[in-house]
Amino acid sequence: MEEDDSYVPSDLTAEERQELENIRRRKQELLADIQRLKDEIAEVANEIENLGSTEERKNMQRNKQVAMGRKKFNMDPKKGIQFLIENDLLKNTCEDIAQFLYKGEGLNKTAIGDYLGERDEFNIQVLHAFVELHEFTDLNLVQALRQFLWSFRLPGEAQKIDRMMEAFAQRYCQCNNGVFQSTDTCYVLSFAIIMLNTSLHNPNVKDKPTVERFIAMNRGINDGGDLPEELLRNLYESIKNEPFKIPEDDGNDLTHTFFNPDREGWLLKLGGGRVKTWKRRWFILTDNCLYYFEYTTDKEPRGIIPLENLSIREVEDSKKPNCFELYIPDNKDQVIKACKTEADGRVVEGNHTVYRISAPTPEEKEEWIKCIKAAISRDPFYEMLAARKKKVSSTKRH
């Protein structure tokens, strides 16, 4: 039963009545205070709840935008970076962008390589900041290259590779003072190691270099002097025992090679066996090589024809129109260095002294000849490396 606050017993003195009234008033004040505190607590709890969900929403929105930025970067690196900067997810500084690329979370390593290889002044600054994030102190050159080449995928263009490997050589020499006479020596040896890796571990390369040949190839590159034989032997053994782990992103290495070909299309190829038959093949011209496939959807080519040291000419053929040939100038009987995959999956050397090919139309024949001629005459990567090698070999130590 609720107490009636208005009831006053009749036997109380005036003083007791006053005391009772004071107690009752204080009680009402306390009840009002308690209610006010309850209301305040409820309000604060509500605010905390709203604040939590607002923060959560903000984080979710931010994560969504970062994911979108990564996707954009993987499709178009410059647009992706621009999007992240515009949405305050990345600072517009070479250091911040380099850190983002170095962490590489969710990023396609081919896209990282393309961005770092650009020749814009800002991209070059990002490249140097990116290389600075790598710690190469006390690593031998193969160990440093393993770390570096895993952080992105080297692009195909010679000038881009040159800039990136130059930055690597500078950083390696900075971390390991005194190992090489100059950054040029480090640069040339780095390429020698990358090419050694290909020669030793590519099944299409039949002639595997020995350690003696590797040492001989690198004579005189240390500003005119030789590098210690033990160093070269160690580097050779390291690569022989464990090939470089190259980022693949989307399928195998070759898939990437065929993304931006110089030219592609259906052609007829005359077989090199005893019975000469014409076979329809899908040809792709890229990276100074002519690849041919049975179907456009095949990931692995049926054959590879390196264009180095070859020439091209138009020819007449009694059976097929619009023909041209690949051949070795001044040596008509020499077999062209090439390889093909047999039906059982074995990779064998080709046996052609010439490759005769027929195009569907005269226009396509002209276009193929023009593109192949351009590929044969242009090999800036090897020209660039040869020039650097000549420079370090001819330098005399003072």
UniProtKB/Swiss-Prot annotation:
Gene3D superfamilies assigned: 1.10.220.20, Arf Nucleotide-binding Site Opener,domain 2, Pleckstrin-homology domain (PH domain)/Phosphotyrosine-binding domain (PTB)
Signal peptide coordinates: none
GO biological process: establishment of epithelial cell polarity; regulation of ARF protein signal transduction; regulation of cell adhesion; vesicle-mediated transport
Residues the entry annotates as binding a 1,2-diacyl-sn-glycero-3-phospho-(1D-myo-inositol-3,4,5-trisphosphate): 269-277, 281, 292, 302, 351
Annotated PH domain residues: 260-377
Tissues in which the UniProt entry reports expression: Ubiquitous.
Chain segments carrying region C-terminal autoinhibitory region: 388-396
Ranges in coiled-coil conformation: 10-67
The record's account of how the chain is modified after translation: Ubiquitinated by SCF(FBXW11) E3 ubiquitin-protein ligase complex. Ubiquitination induces proteasomal degradation.
Pfam families for the chain: PH (PF00169), Sec7 (PF01369)
Name recorded for this polypeptide: Cytohesin-1
Lineage of origin: Eukaryota, Metazoa, Chordata, Craniata, Vertebrata
